[in-house]
């Protein structure tokens, strides 16, 4: 199989990268009726598989799970979860031939083998769906021409998909139709109905392409979503301990600090996050963020270049073929870091303290979001896609670190995301270590001295303008406003 993106000419590549349209709520007036009586079979019962299935069943659809015979015979976790929730479970041979819609929600590295196994069993004219397009775009999987191929990709972990649905809402969702596999011209209708069944239409749906989803998703998870958080945690902890901060407190300030500062980001973007700082702290966070961007911009651009060219996928798939040797080694090394092994502190930290003593953390988030967003847009990815793969998902990943540090983050994210995170982290740590070590303790761990809160008015005005007037802030305000409006409509 050859990389699908690389098989296209430049004009086709740019057209696919630039596909992104925020769909109007009225386009989902038919709900999930288009697939109401279909037999829908889900492959994989992990977080996305189980929670999407629960939502779709609650929306009135017919859901079953196809598992490998050994998973059923040995009553593995996937079988246990599906049966505990009252779903019909069977083998591929038992369920796939009668399926109208097959949802491939298995891990990326299993896609080629899984799709190769189910395709001969799928009936003429059936539909195959993905929640991530890596197999189609990077591996170049070719699907039988009579099969419709779609994507429905909720922009959050599977548990959040379920919780938001139970609240009567949903999560922002990306949908796409593979242009090589839309024989009946109804791929978009199927994807819309599927997204509606999971609750995605209540939060906002982007009509995109397989290529735009893959390239932006890989970039976001490698840089701001995982790589920057891991790098900041490791270096920030080392810095505080070297400055004499008690290890448990240092770890807690970072572990819970990521979640606290990105909660402000979630509600009001970079502007709101920065406004949580005092005026002197805001100025310093802005200056640090500018320094970080200068240092890291070439690394962000290299990751984007390697993602666009297919170099990242090529090297990662080599590691797949080598039994994940690099991934497993890097995972073990992360588990040995000081941050991961620091004692758990029971000391209470007030919410505002995470901002006051975490100026560096705020600067890392600001720099990472802006760099990731701007780098994606400069590569031809539309702003809305870049926003969802940078600022929007950052609080969701920070929440995982708040539970069990980097271990939890790397368990929850895909192996593809984890591999890319380690690549970024290994390059970013040596780039930033001297800068972080040279910082004043006031910027992480101690907080600014209370002697004066005075600032230069003109400097503050200029910095406030620079914070507010960026593309990521403009598009973020628009998309967050849409979600707020939708919550009001759904709750009415």
From Swiss-Prot:
Record keyword Disulfide bond present: no
EC numbers, comma separated: 1.1.1.86
Binding site for Mg(2+) 1: 217, 221
One Pfam family cited in the UniProt record for this chain: KARI_N
UniProt-annotated binding residues for Mg(2+) 2: 217, 389, 393
Entry keywords, A to Z: Amino-acid biosynthesis, Branched-chain amino acid biosynthesis, Magnesium, Metal-binding, NADP, Oxidoreductase, Repeat
Active-site residues per Swiss-Prot or TrEMBL entry: 132
Cofactor binding note from Swiss-Prot or TrEMBL: Binds 2 magnesium ions per subunit.
Gene Ontology CC: one annotated term: cytosol
NCBIfam families for the chain: ilvC, PRK05225.1
Function: Involved in the biosynthesis of branched-chain amino acids (BCAA). Catalyzes an alkyl-migration followed by a ketol-acid reduction of (S)-2-acetolactate (S2AL) to yield (R)-2,3-dihydroxy-isovalerate. In the isomerase reaction, S2AL is rearranged via a Mg-dependent methyl migration to produce 3-hydroxy-3-methyl-2-ketobutyrate (HMKB). In the reductase reaction, this 2-ketoacid undergoes a metal-dependent reduction by NADPH to yield (R)-2,3-dihydroxy-isovalerate.
Protein family according to the UniProt entry: Belongs to the ketol-acid reductoisomerase family.
Protein name per Swiss-Prot or TrEMBL: Ketol-acid reductoisomerase (NADP(+))
Species in which this protein is naturally found: Shewanella oneidensis (strain ATCC 700550 / JCM 31522 / CIP 106686 / LMG 19005 / NCIMB 14063 / MR-1)
Lineage: Bacteria, Pseudomonadati, Pseudomonadota, Gammaproteobacteria, Alteromonadales
């Amino acid at each position: 199989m050859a990389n699908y993106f690389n098989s296209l000419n430049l004009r086709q590549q740019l057209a696919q990268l630039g596909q992104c349209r925020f769909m109007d709520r009225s386009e989902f007036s038919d709900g999930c009726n288009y697939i109401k009586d279909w037999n829908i079979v889900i492959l994989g019962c992990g977080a996305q598989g189980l929670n999407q299935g629960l939502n779709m069943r609650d929306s009135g659809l017919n859901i079953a799970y196809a598992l490998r015979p050994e998973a059923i015979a040995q009553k593995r976790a996937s079988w246990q979860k599906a049966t505990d929730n009252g779903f019909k479970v069977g083998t591929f041979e038992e369920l796939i031939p009668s399926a109208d819609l097959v949802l491939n929600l298995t891990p990326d590295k299993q896609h080629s083998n899984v799709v190769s196994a189910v395709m001969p069993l799928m009936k003429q004219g059936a539909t195959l769906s993905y929640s991530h397009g890596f197999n189609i775009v990077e591996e170049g999987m070719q699907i039988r021409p009579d099969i419709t191929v779609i994507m429905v990709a909720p922009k959050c972990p599977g548990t959040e998909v379920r919780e938001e649905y139970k609240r009567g809402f949903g999560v922002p969702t990306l949908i796409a139709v593979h242009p090589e596999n839309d024989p009946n011209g109804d791929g978009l209708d199927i994807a819309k109905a599927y997204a509606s069944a999971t609750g995605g239409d209540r939060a906002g749906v982007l009509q995109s392409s397989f290529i735009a989803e893959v390239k932006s998703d890989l970039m976001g998870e490698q840089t701001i979503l995982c790589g920057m958080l891991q790098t900041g945690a490791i270096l920030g902890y080392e810095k505080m301990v070297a400055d004499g901060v008690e290890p448990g407190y240092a770890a807690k300030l970072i572990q819970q600090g990521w979640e606290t500062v990105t909660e402000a980001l979630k509600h009001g973007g970079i502007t709101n996050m920065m406004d949580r700082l005092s005026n002197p702290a805001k100025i310093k966070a802005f200056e640090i963020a500018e320094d970080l961007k200068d240092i890291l911009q070439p690394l962000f651009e290299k990751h984007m270049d390697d993602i666009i060219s297919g170099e990242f996928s090529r090297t990662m798939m080599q590691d797949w073929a080598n039994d994940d040797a690099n991934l497993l080694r890097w995972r073990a090394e992360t588990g040995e870091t000081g941050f991961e092994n620091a004692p758990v502190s029971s000391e209470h930290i007030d919410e505002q303290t995470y901002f006051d003593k975490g100026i560096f953390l705020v600067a890392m988030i600001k720099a990472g979001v802006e760099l990731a967003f701007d780098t994606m847009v400069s590569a031809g990815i539309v702003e809305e896609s870049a926003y969802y793969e940078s600022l929007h998902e950052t609080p969701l990943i920070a929440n995982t670190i708040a539970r069990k540090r980097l271990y939890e983050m790397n368990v929850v994210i895909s192996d593809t995301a984890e591999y890319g995170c380690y690549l970024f982290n290994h390059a970013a740590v040596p780039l930033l270590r001297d800068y972080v070590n040279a910082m004043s303790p006031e910027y992480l761990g101690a907080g600014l001295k209370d002697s004066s809160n005075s600032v230069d008015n003109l400097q503050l005005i200029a910095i406030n303008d620079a914070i507010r007037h960026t593309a990521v802030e403009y598009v973020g305000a628009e998309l967050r406003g849409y979600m707020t409006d939708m919550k009001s409509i759904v709750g009415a």
